[in-house]
Amino acid sequence: MTYASNSCVISLIKSYLLRFIVTCSIPFLFLGCSSQDSANTDGQGSTTGSKPVVFVPISPYQFIFEKIAGDLIDIKVIVGEGDDPHSYSPTPKQIVDMAKANLLCSGELGFESNYFVKLGDGKTGPLELNLLEKLDLLEGHCDHPSHKTEDPNDDLDHDHEDLNDPHVWLSPTTLMVQSDQIAKKLKELLPKDSESIIDTNLENFKKDLSEIHAELGELLKPDSGKKFYVYHSAFAYFAQDYSLEQIAIEIGNKSPTPKQSAKIAEQAKKEEVKVIFVQPQFDQTSAKALAESINGRVAKIDPLEKDIVANLREIATAIKSSL
């Protein structure tokens, strides 16, 4: 075979090989494009041009963000319905998704210490918003370990020091301050032409809060100074707003000892308490035992209901009926 013939054969083989490679590569090219499109998130947890993704710890905060931002953002709730936020552990998928988000909100509910997400500027990593910023916080209990401020060189036990009560969403007055901080962060996150929408929504939401605060103030005014008994101490800010006092059965995120239960029961009998309030996320055994010992009953109030305004009314009505 001549050199020219060899060249023709080689050219023909190259031609067939090229066609084969191109044909086989087409599906992978499309797959690659699809993968690239799905991964084209600008580091923000959502595809380019879509809504910014915001993670909030519990559904009441979802309600606030929806009221202020409307449909400008995509809101994800970390702790699901029926779960206890104090002991919740996010799934691996949730942690991956949070790392891709635009904004990650923390409420110092305890479970935030169960994961780590590298923060950023909203593009290379999520912005952070501490939902307790600018608030006049009440002292909490050792079931909320996310805000300890102890000296790492100090060997003493400080389990009960410098802890904040995180249940701030159950107070209209603290919600107003929170709403301002949320609106400020949303303006940082969203385009400038969204500011007027945020301002209008914020004004309307604060009006709703002001109205419910006035309504509940009138409802509970005759009961000023009275006590109500709860299993979990989630209602201190609510009590503060309306000059009430909550008495918690749970001590340091644990059921009371028999001795402690006896002391609480004795106090409840003296104060003629007939209702022990429980929330569905917690074991109710101790509360039911206490209720039986005082010839009372348990009643449910759920601090984690999404619609804060409606829930505040329900909580107030339930407490009012027990006083």
Stretches found by the model and what they are:
Residues 12, 16-30:
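Bacterial N-terminal signal peptides
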Residues 1-15:
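N-terminal secretory signal peptides that target proteins for export/translocation
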